[in-house]
Amino acid sequence: MTEGSILGKMILFVLPMMATNLLQVAYNAADMMVVSLSHEDNAVGAIGMTGAFVNLVLNFFIGFSVGANVVIAQRIGAKEGKLASRVVHTSLILGVLVGVLGGIIGFIIAEPVLSLMGAKNNLLELATLYTRIYFAGAPFMALTNYAVAVFRAKGDAKTPLYVLSASGLINVLFNLVFVLVFGMSVDGVAWATVISNAISAIALVFCLSHSNDDCRFDFKQLRIDRRSLRDIIRIGFPAGIQSALFSFSNMMIQSSVLRVNDILAPGSVYEPVVEGNAAVSNLNGFIYTATNSVSQGSVAFTSQNVGAGKYDRVKKVMISSYAITTVVALIFSSGIFIFNHQLLSLYGIVDADGLAAIAYDSAMIKMRCETLPYFILAWMEVACGIIRGFGKSITSAIISLVGACLLRVVWLLTVFEYFLTLESIYISYPVSWLLTAAIAQVVVILELRKHNGHKTANTTVAT
């Protein structure tokens, strides 16, 4: 990462990581596609309803894995092998602890929070059931994310790909068995996800224990190092806050979608707008995951070059990241829009009459307003990733808070309240992305100028 061509190395690093992340998203996609075959009318909407809340709880705690990624990468870049090993063992302990804590909190508050978001009757029952089972596997999910962060920090994106490929197939297999053979619904796909996450967590830790570098896991060295913990929290806490704030604003989005649903389909047991929103949100998850992989790559490349003091390469990392993420976003978003009919049918959303038409139209509105301009979010993620790579995680969190979350909340309280339409909800996404991306890019430019200025000054003094 600190030598040679950046673009080529970044592509080789990002592609397997992208495939790995897409497999994790495929877990949820498989859940929703298979559960659409069950006897429950609101099953797809129930799973989609839980996304923002689940992410609010888990992303805060799992967000600390960003800190582990950055700190380990910086230690490796600085050739500090022993310190890197301490960070690895500290991060794995932290992963289990935050997973248990997040799981307990999520399990307890699931029903009241989902009810507060506007879910009721059958939708509330299904969403609560799915969420509570999902949170039972939170420790495995957290450990998986922390182990993956270790592999990525040392430049190995292939091992997580192989492990998650296998566990992903197991997840789909259990989905089909639980739903089609045993007649289960959201509970079946939730348990399938828990089982697959447990398998991936155990397998990744096993692989770490057999690695031959400073990131090797050794049970005898499993202890919390205070310095490592402090560094992880310093960078990971703001990243967790940033993820949680995004999820909070998305919860408000989900609540607003439910309000529009009640306007368009009053008194209906079936929630067509919720179903359409859930299907497209799941498809958009593939775009976000693909582009976020580029952002994570920019974090790793920036962190190692910052650790090695090679600030001139960071600008090249930025340019390469923007180029890759733009191409990836446009390919995914245009593909989803072009093949919308076929993709939506996988979730049971078809262009028919009555309530089915409302579900389909709602999905298409979301695609036009949110899916097509997703490349703007990709820019935002790269800029914020480079800022985190500099170790300025708090700065990145503040930018996201003001530019994306706060603006989106204000938008919902003003613009949406005036129009009460789906368009007035979804257009808030590209507007907030663009503002945040612009602010983040200014910060990146200032950071590069600062370090290049210091380098020039030091060279002058040495001369």
Which residues are covered by each model-predicted region?
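Transmembrane helical elements of multi-pass membrane transporters/channels
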Residues: 12-31, 133, 167, 196-200, ...
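Small-residue-rich hydrophobic transmembrane alpha-helices
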Residues: 44-104, 141-160, 254, 274-340, ...
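Short alpha-helical transmembrane segments in multi-pass integral membrane proteins
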Residues: 1-14, 72-139, 170, 181-237, ...
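Helix-terminus/linker motif at the lipid-water interface of multi-pass membrane proteins
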Residues: 22, 26-44, 114-121, 177-184, ...
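Short runs within selected transmembrane alpha-helices of multi-pass transporters and secretion channels
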Residues: 65, 134-152, 160-171, 189-204, ...
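Transmembrane alpha-helix boundary and packing residues in multipass membrane permease domains
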Residues: 17, 21, 33, 70, ...
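Small-residue hotspots at the loop-to-helix junctions and early N-terminal turns
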Residues: 41-52, 127, 131, 190, ...
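Residue-level signal for short hydrophobic patches within transmembrane helices
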Residues: 3, 7-26, 30, 53-60, ...
